[in-house]
Amino acid sequence: MSDELTTTVYYDEDADVSTINDETVAVLGYGSQGHAHALNLHESGVDVIVGLRQDSSSWADAEDAGLRVETPDVAAGEADRVVMLVPDTIQPAVYEAIEDELDAGDTLQFAHGFNIHYGQIEPPEDVDVTMVAPKSPGHLVRRTYERGEGTPGLIAVYQDATGNAKQESLAYAKGIGCTRAGVIETSFQEEVETDLFGEQAVLCGGVTEMVKAGFETLVDAGYAPEMAYFECLNELKLIVDLMYEGGHMGMWNSVSDTAEYGGLTRGEEVIDREGMEKILEEVQNGEFAREWINENQANRPAYKQYRDAEQNHQIEAVGENLRELFAWGEDADAETTEAPADD
């Protein structure tokens, strides 16, 4: 099996922040990603305006951090590069408010390609449309930058009206610290489809359902809920950390032979590959996107029901009680509050 990379990775030496030093960058949103992008760019010598609603609770925070703040339309009107860092669901409305401020040669930039790929935003042909996407929560983008490090990221060019879209995207990625760790070149389609599939089938959907099913199996069989929680949820972090640091083999080499043999011989029994293929197909053909767009237009009735069911699951109460009893719970709960939604 070849170990050669199939994608291009760029680092600091491949990018020059001065490429965008003569630009004004409007960062729309000041939540998890927005605050990190704005502050990191500002400290990299880039002229930044933060675009927020006048009643935004983040307005004062951004000003206190030394940033200039304007409404989105004003920020976009003064900017050469408009960076959409508000949630996907409100981006079309924000774009409608700022689209007349885009001039030929400007750049419309995203951190996720959902609205471009699925046609919710259709930019004019005379602007660059790009993506710079850190593969990390915003608070880590900021924290690692302050330490002189960075988080990996992606760049993509959807529309290159100026001929400079790629180099300027790399410059932006360097400005927020991503080229310190490495930036992969991809496409809007690939980023969106792999991201949605990963979230649904593995990272957010698959893992949580597997944890709940394991917890329920043990509790239904008469085992203590606290033991079920430790075995199926708490220890998951330990295993994922090993995989993150050393891949699957790094994990297998760190667990007992009994755990390794049991995992290798039984793990496949809990995986539904046909279900995974169906999830991917619904991402690729736009079925999931249409469902999610319609759900938002209907004020999220199903979404709210699913969230209520999660909140009321026994594993939540058991976990809350255990986290109050053990020191690691304080760190875990604090970590979940560090990344507010973009405003």
From Swiss-Prot:
Cofactor(s) listed in the protein's UniProt record: Mg(2+)
Molecular functions per Gene Ontology: ketol-acid reductoisomerase activity; magnesium ion binding; NADP binding
Keyword NADP annotated: yes
Binding site for NADP(+): 30-33, 53, 56, 58, 88-91, 138
Keywords noted in UniProt: Amino-acid biosynthesis, Branched-chain amino acid biosynthesis, Magnesium, Metal-binding, NADP, Oxidoreductase
Active site, UniProt feature: 112
Listed GO biological process terms: isoleucine biosynthetic process; L-valine biosynthetic process
UniProt cross-references to Pfam families, sorted A to Z: KARI_C, KARI_N
Co-factor binding details: Binds 2 magnesium ions per subunit.
Annotated residues for binding of substrate: 256
Residues annotated for Mg(2+) 1 binding in this entry: 195, 199
InterPro entries for this protein: 6-PGluconate_DH-like_C_sf, KARI, KARI_C, KARI_N, KARI_prok, NAD(P)-bd_dom_sf
Catalyzed chemical reaction(s): (2R)-2,3-dihydroxy-3-methylbutanoate + NADP(+) = (2S)-2-acetolactate + NADPH + H(+); (2R,3R)-2,3-dihydroxy-3-methylpentanoate + NADP(+) = (S)-2-ethyl-2-hydroxy-3-oxobutanoate + NADPH + H(+)
The EC number(s) this enzyme carries: 1.1.1.86
Superkingdom assignment: Archaea
Cellular component terms per the entry's GO annotation: cytosol
Binding of Mg(2+) 2, residues: 195, 231, 235
Record domain KARI N-terminal Rossmann: where: 7-186
Family in the record: Belongs to the ketol-acid reductoisomerase family.
Function, as annotated: Involved in the biosynthesis of branched-chain amino acids (BCAA). Catalyzes an alkyl-migration followed by a ketol-acid reduction of (S)-2-acetolactate (S2AL) to yield (R)-2,3-dihydroxy-isovalerate. In the isomerase reaction, S2AL is rearranged via a Mg-dependent methyl migration to produce 3-hydroxy-3-methyl-2-ketobutyrate (HMKB). In the reductase reaction, this 2-ketoacid undergoes a metal-dependent reduction by NADPH to yield (R)-2,3-dihydroxy-isovalerate.
Matching PANTHER family: KETOL-ACID REDUCTOISOMERASE, MITOCHONDRIAL (PTHR21371:SF1)
Protein name: Ketol-acid reductoisomerase (NADP(+))
